[in-house]
């Protein structure tokens, strides 16, 4: 291949020196992409491709204007590309270009997304004796936040859950995780984050510790308690190293180090956040999510903070009570609340403006936005102090956290310097007010006097020459010129020097005009240079106050989030919950916070404590079982956000995690069936939940055969009750499980009530779903009735009801057996009342198997508990003879299996093994 020279050669040389996916190189007023990069960018952004010749070869070229680079780079980063930027600057020998930054998903300052934009690193240190130790660090370079934690004696699931709470845009796996395919696969499944392999040396303990202490100071590192947490420090050092490597000046914005422990936040894994639809619905839309429902914020920072609160609920009761008190005060001070919200609606995003200032990318409009927002702090403070209810609340203390005097001083400095509406570019002048600097004022006066001379020149020349069609203008080619209409060119003075002829006019210059042009250009350049120098100093002053901007921005964001929660509480009649230690969960007239916005909602009570830990929820299809359980989880979550809740009253015992197995999300695209996903989610819950957790289980086991499903559901229930002891709500159509309410002391049954008679063969029935939850079990699901409501053809509905009635009358289900010589199939029939097999019976063509049931006697005979083989009846020998060897082997294993002593996941695997054996016969 011919070696390129010139601009293309320079581009290719720079590209070889970076590991970025794409390179944008400034060439004058454009950023250009060459060669393969040009083809990629053109395809992704629909740009026109031209050709650039170099050393006998032709290279594709695509470009974007300098002023339009940001949106194009943002689009590329959103598509997963890492884009290097090579800026052009002047030297004594002409132009020079160098890579100044690499824009990646986790280091993108100019993002248009108002939500947090986290870059995270995860490190693992293996342990032979117990669980591993994980270090996790995450920073949002757009706001300067930096958070770090260490998980001791943890597993991969806990680390992944912790990572997911940040919703990172980019993740740096530590060296020991890069070859762990299982971990990386799970990481890809749970997040959309880009995975980047950063320099392994940056993860080394010594180097990482030096990097962290250099950035934040040894005193800060030790005071937040991570000085001796080597694994956490390794992750933190890698994040800081990556930020420094990818962006000049970006690291200066990272000033707020926060360390948190494992007990600071509620565990919300990816499955739970999805199932509870915290920030987006199951369909992937933000509209209709919990955040969308309760978000009444008027600032970007306030909305971002409220979303973070939802995704990372707290376990600190004092902090939750502080938040509740702020919401309560604003709820009771309507006029002051609206005054504050109206003031905040004029606020800009100070946290992100601070990051832009420290990185050197802030323009004059950004600094004016800083000034205007800092000035609002005093107005908000006045609204609080002038309202007795607010002045006596923690809101007053929150405002004390921001240095109002320093904020007022910086705001005054910026206001005295900048014009009210500065231009968008900082190189074209017009940024500063008169009086900011005497030398600058003198240059501005001279420049504007020269411009005024030019502005009045046409009138003077018309009067002097008598020419009516005369104007003065300027362009890049001709500079300043006098233009005269063709009909009057004979009247031009002799000193007019002709420079160009057009169709209807001619252009001239004069010695005076040439001299004045030189003066204007000289003064213009001097003015622009001086203004830019002053602007750089002013921007540096703002950057020095980055921590102040972040503090004020955080304060205003908190006020906005509190006001948003107060607005929603007042408009929807929400109540302040009592947040307590212990396992009590008491909800009076609770409602679902999202569903109640669109549907007339029937409130329901819920009570759980140490003696009532596990609720089995039964009831018809479409009756509201899932909604009832979700609202319990959401009320708990909202209480641990610090919000009021949709209920008449509520007492919420603090939980350490909320875990859900809800719905039937099929992930066939990843090669996993609905049932496999369900079992993996159940496995995660059984491994992760503790006695302080809240667990929501919806229809566990329904994705497989009936016996398998009941066995798994039964065993999981026993395991949770006996081993984990977490508060659990379990909705099921396996009515056999309700027997556990009599056998296990902390298990209770509740059901969603129905009014009327169910449909039966020959009768339409009349059923009303009351949506009311009552104590005790139910034994009907009304599935055929729901099928009728859904519009299933009447013959199918009628036949379904007839089959259902027969099964109920017979109280038996039939199990597949061995083939007979006549082509029929012998069925092993299991009697639901006796808990024993009946005589085998041949049926031509093979009768359909029944639809439900665990082999358990309905009279509660303890000899026939789930997982144990029914006692052999008088016809036991005949039954054995009628079954094939595979079925008999499975029954034999089932007889010997102790369900109570078998872990649920192992039991699940055994059931799947039996199912495979029977399917293969």
Curated annotation (Swiss-Prot):
GO terms for biological process: mismatch repair. Transmembrane segments: none annotated. Keywords: ATP-binding, DNA damage, DNA repair, DNA-binding, Nucleotide-binding. Pfam families: MutS_I, MutS_II, MutS_III, MutS_IV, MutS_V. Residues 840-853 have a biased composition (Low complexity). The keyword DNA repair applies. GO terms for molecular function: ATP binding; ATP-dependent DNA damage sensor activity; damaged DNA binding; mismatched DNA binding. Belongs to the DNA mismatch repair MutS family. This protein is involved in the repair of mismatches in DNA. It is possible that it carries out the mismatch recognition step. This protein has a weak ATPase activity. HAMAP family: MutS. This is DNA mismatch repair protein MutS 1.
